[in-house]
């Protein structure tokens, strides 16, 4: 029985890639800098002491990071008994965004350039804004700028509730984000507005990767909270991913947990499981692993590392989340059967010690575990697509156009 379980620790980079300089990210190192901050006693909110990841260390995380940067992450166990195959991968795709990273993991790198709204103020073309106001019958809009999602709620949330004007904002990523109050504006209305925005961006040739619905609740600044009802409207991958091939060629199952289905625009996904928060995502993953049959991929995105800690530059929060993930990892590993493969990886970096609030261009860890997987170094993988090619070969699918089988 062949089953693969892919866990994406969203934004968990392990050192700047060779091309990081052109992204302004030379020297970024999500894992390394978190570990250093913990060792210096600078990440003692909600946790304390050196970064402790014994289970990830046994899978080779520390050694993969050392291969990536030349430095072993401080605090991790150098003498861990390695039980998995480990390496690090560079990104072939042109961006450092979520869709590019995930599509490349599934064997389809993004070799074109996304469109971006690069102006920090008055970010969106007036023609686009006018169409959205008219089609969605809006009283106007707020924002129209680059911002962190939590900051803009404190700035404009109250005005949004009074006026009914949605908050439009973007970032260094190829995104059009819309924040609206779940109760005063309405969740269904927000989703409808996002559908309209997706249509207009596509029809207008803007080449924007995602429209993101950002619903929130609360009644005043400091009390506004984003809810778990986020919804991403992505464009479809430009070629069949290994997910789609498993479904098409083997009649297989691909179970999306978290935001995976949205990232692939629902293509190649046979079942969606919604969960919010690290523990809930872990619980859902374990339940689906228990039920998984032959020719199944269970694919989970642990978004909190990125959204709650990376972008918010919360080092202690990121460290605590990694330690929580590590503590729960044995529950997941206990479910691995003889022919199963477990892959732990990431889609980009988001160094919480780095200036700004954006992603960082980094290598990702590639940790592979299973009874038939030979422990040891996988070395430097030249593309995330090596993961997709490995999974395609494991299931006996037609080869992907990019990547090499690692096993």
Swiss-Prot record:
Q: Which reaction does it catalyse?
A: 2-deoxy-alpha-D-ribose 1-phosphate = 2-deoxy-D-ribose 5-phosphate; alpha-D-ribose 1-phosphate = D-ribose 5-phosphate
Span of the secretion signal?
A: none
Main EC class the enzyme belongs to = isomerase
Q: Name one GO molecular function term.
A: manganese ion binding
The free-text note explaining how the cofactor binds reads:
Binds 2 manganese ions.
**Which EC number(s) does the record attach to this protein?**
5.4.2.7
For this UniProt record, the keywords arranged alphabetically read as follows: Cytoplasm, Isomerase, Manganese, Metal-binding
Keyword Plastid annotated = no
Residues binding Mn(2+) 1 are 10, 347-348
Identify the residues that bind Mn(2+) 2: 306, 311, 359
Q: Where in the cell is it found?
A: Cytoplasm
What main location does UniProt list?
cytoplasm
Which pathway is recorded for this entry?
Carbohydrate degradation; 2-deoxy-D-ribose 1-phosphate degradation; D-glyceraldehyde 3-phosphate and acetaldehyde from 2-deoxy-alpha-D-ribose 1-phosphate: step 1/2
In its UniProt record, which GO terms are filed under biological process?
2-deoxyribose 1-phosphate catabolic process; 5-phosphoribose 1-diphosphate biosynthetic process; metabolic compound salvage; nucleotide metabolic process
Q: Which family does it belong to?
A: Belongs to the phosphopentomutase family.
- Which PANTHER family is this protein grouped with? PHOSPHOPENTOMUTASE (PTHR21110:SF0)
Q: Per its database record, what is this protein's job?
A: Isomerase that catalyzes the conversion of deoxy-ribose 1-phosphate (dRib-1-P) and ribose 1-phosphate (Rib-1-P) to deoxy-ribose 5-phosphate (dRib-5-P) and ribose 5-phosphate (Rib-5-P), respectively.
Q: What is this protein's name?
A: Phosphopentomutase
- Organism whose genome encodes this protein: Yersinia pestis
Query: Source organism lineage?
Result: Bacteria, Pseudomonadati, Pseudomonadota, Gammaproteobacteria, Enterobacterales
Q: Which gene encodes it?
A: deoB
């Amino acid at each position: 029985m062949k089953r693969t379980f892919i866990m994406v620790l969203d934004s968990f980079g392990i050192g700047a890639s060779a091309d990081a300089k052109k992204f302004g990210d030379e020297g970024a190192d999500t894992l390394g800098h978190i570990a250093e901050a913990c060792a210096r006693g600078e990440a003692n909110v909600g946790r304390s002491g050196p970064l402790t990841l014994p289970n990830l260390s046994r899978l080779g995380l520390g050694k993969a990071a050392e291969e990536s940067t030349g430095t072993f992450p401080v605090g991790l166990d150098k003498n861990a008994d390695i039980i998995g195959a480990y390496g690090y991968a560079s990104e072939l795709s042109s961006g450092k965004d979520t869709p590019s990273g995930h599509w490349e993991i599934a064997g389809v790198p993004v070799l074109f350039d996304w469109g971006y709204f690069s102006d920090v103020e008055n970010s969106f073309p007036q023609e686009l804004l006018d169409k959205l106001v008219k089609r969605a019958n809006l009283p106007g809009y707020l924002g129209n700028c680059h911002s962190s999602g939590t900051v803009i709620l404190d700035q404009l949330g109250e005005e949004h509730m009074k006026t009914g004007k949605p908050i439009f904002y973007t970032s260094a990523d190829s995104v059009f984000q819309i924040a609206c109050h779940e109760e005063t504006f309405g969740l269904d209305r927000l989703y409808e507005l996002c559908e309209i925005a997706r249509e207009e961006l596509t029809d207008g040739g803007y080449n924007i990767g995602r429209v993101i619905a950002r619903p929130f609740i609360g009644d005043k600044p400091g009390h506004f909270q984003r809810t778990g009802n986020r919804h991403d409207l992505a464009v479809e991958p430009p070629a069949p991913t290994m997910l789609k091939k498993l479904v098409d060629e083997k009649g297989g199952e691909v179970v999306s947990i978290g935001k995976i289905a949205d990232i692939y625009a629902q293509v190649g996904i046979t079942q969606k499981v919604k969960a919010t928060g690290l523990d809930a995502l872990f619980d859902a993953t374990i339940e689906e692993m228990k039920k998984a049959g032959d020719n199944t991929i269970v694919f989970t995105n642990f978004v909190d590392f990125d959204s709650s800690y990376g972008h918010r530059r919360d080092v202690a929060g990121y460290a605590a989340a990694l330690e929580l993930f590590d503590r729960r990892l044995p529950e997941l590993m206990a479910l691995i059967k003889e022919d199963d493969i477990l892959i732990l990886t990431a889609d980009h970096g988001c160094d919480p010690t780095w200036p700004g609030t954006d992603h960082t261009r980094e290598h990702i860890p590639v940790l592979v575990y299973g009874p038939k997987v030979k422990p040891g170094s996988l070395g430097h993988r030249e593309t995330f697509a090596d993961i997709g090619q490995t999974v395609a070969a494991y299931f006996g699918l037609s080869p992907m156009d990019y990547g090499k089988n690692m096993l």
